[in-house]
């Protein structure tokens, strides 16, 4: 086991505080509409330019191990805020720095750290309740666009794109962000259910100009098995041909004689047909087939429940208004399934989301909800260079997380105003002793720090602006972009309540632990041994005689 270096008391706290300040100072320059960029050197490729707090925090490692521990703990604040709400990482870092700095001053003055922490926790709990009371629901497109714009660093085209995407696919819909190929941002919306499986044979294509298969008002056969024998399918094919409608087959696989016969029948015009593999694998495939069955009012033909393909009738087939299939994807538009059945299925999947233990499972289940409930929107980010593309894509993703958080828990006045108002309401909050009261004051003073930092980054005097904002009431605040005072909500400067709440809770949690630290332990740096290689080689000179 390696030898350890141990520091106690003030020595430990001073080192830790230095690390906290190095990381927080690097992150906080990005806060607000006039925040600056940070350039991150990469071991390969060109440097990355970002205004995203958590991206900056993740890059910072300090040489001094005690200072690095302080930096890593603040990095944890940014990461947790990012995981919880997808945004607010810089705010969380600024809050943590303010609480740690003020708290450690109180500890140095002889206060009991445990009571200080209890005071901080008490103030934060009360602040969270006040934030919830201040929160306003965010449901209309205008508010969603404003939240997206603020989170994307005052880029209103991003805000509009996200609002448009949410309007098209609903609040539950899947919205993904991809790198585009042009200079302009684009929004592609896929209405209906899309899954990543294309046609099994190019001979099914009936739209050569687009290389796609389009079926109008088709029947949909869902089979949880491989189909290789055409005899199994003859009764269904004959019934569909009589009905004069096209047929889409979704099965584990269609191969051999069955696929060849379908292709021949399709090319001769006897029955218009296309076949695709079912999406997913194993249990997930069974579940997704059931989703499609619910959407199209069909039945999954499965031997597990005693159904045979030969006995399938038109009543077992699903139906949709239209199906579009290309090389890689299938889209089912306007399935005829009943709304009540679809909502029941969605509720069932939501229950599974709550019980899911892994992020991967949760993500896949949420995708299934979106495909059933709304649709899929893809925002394609346009930029002139790869460096700009990466920076912009990160901003759009942040803005998307922020708007989702806003829809979930509502919005409060932005620009750090909500926390200033909350702190003003808690001035009379008291603990059970003087040290807890100091802890409460530490937390309330820290709540002004985001506003102060936004103002400082805009090149103004933080104390003057903070006092002016405190003199006002309600949503009255300072717009750093235009350097004007006014109603923040009317000016469209909104923060999601969830983002502000998460930033405050995670900052106080980690900062409270740091204030109560009395001892720090780390590995001693290993001494590099002298390079003995050259000296050892000298003895090999005598080998000359062996030649």
Swiss-Prot record:
InterPro entries given in the database record: Chaperonin_Cpn60_CS, Cpn60/GroEL, Cpn60/GroEL/TCP-1, GroEL-like_apical_dom_sf, GROEL-like_equatorial_sf, TCP-1-like_intermed_sf
Sequence positions that bind ATP: 30-33, 51, 87-91, 415, 479-481, 495
Compartmental location: Cytoplasm
Gene: groEL
Positions in coiled-coil regions: none
Residue ranges crossing the lipid bilayer per the database entry: none
Signal peptide, first to last residue: none
EC number: 5.6.1.7
Name this polypeptide is given: Chaperonin GroEL
Disulphide-bonded residues: none
Alphabetized Pfam families for the sequence: Cpn60_TCP1 (PF00118)
Record family assignment: Belongs to the chaperonin (HSP60) family.
Catalytic activity: ATP + H2O + a folded polypeptide = ADP + phosphate + an unfolded polypeptide
GO biological process: protein refolding
Gene Ontology annotations for the cellular component aspect, listed alphabetically: cytoplasm
PROSITE patterns: CHAPERONINS_CPN60
CDD domains recorded: GroEL
GO molecular function: ATP binding; ATP-dependent protein folding chaperone; isomerase activity; unfolded protein binding
Record keywords: ATP-binding, Chaperone, Cytoplasm, Isomerase, Nucleotide-binding
Native organism taxonomy: Bacteria, Pseudomonadati, Pseudomonadota, Gammaproteobacteria, Enterobacterales
